[in-house]
């Protein structure tokens, strides 16, 4: 951690972690993500988390700390088994429950500094080449 943040102190750093649920399951990597989430801004470091399993984050202290440290959250379609937990944790209105269960690709709830709105992202034609899976 110290070596990472002290190197090139004047440069912004982005740490992107996809499938982050695999890291939050293990004590050492979960603690690193928590430290980065809590202290990164002070050291010009940004943590970008992607995960299909939000319940892994909500069920651990470190995972909740990572979520709580984020200024921005994007909630896409959720597994129906965890929708109630997500709505409660993020203090969403009751209507969000149905949305989170039925969102289509590109639809999400955006929470920015605790301001919440629904969004739809529609790529322009040339972007499709880069995002098709």
Residue map of PLM features:
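Conserved P-loop NTPase motor module
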Residues: 1-9, 100-133
């Amino acid at each position: 951690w110290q070596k990472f943040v002290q190197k090139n102190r004047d440069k912004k750093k982005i740490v992107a972690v996809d499938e982050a649920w695999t890291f939050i399951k293990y004590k050492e990597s979960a603690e690193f993500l928590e430290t980065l989430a809590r202290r990164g801004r002070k050291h010009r470091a940004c943590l970008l988390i992607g995960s299909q399993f939000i319940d892994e984050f909500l069920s651990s202290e470190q995972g909740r700390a990572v979520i709580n440290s984020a200024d921005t959250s994007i909630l896409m379609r959720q597994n129906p088994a965890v929708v109630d937990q997500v709505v409660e944790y993020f203090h969403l209105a009751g209507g969000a429950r149905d949305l989170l269960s039925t969102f289509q690709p590109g639809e999400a709830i955006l929470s920015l500094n605790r301001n919440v709105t629904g969004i739809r992202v529609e790529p322009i034609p040339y972007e499709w080449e880069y995002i098709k899976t």
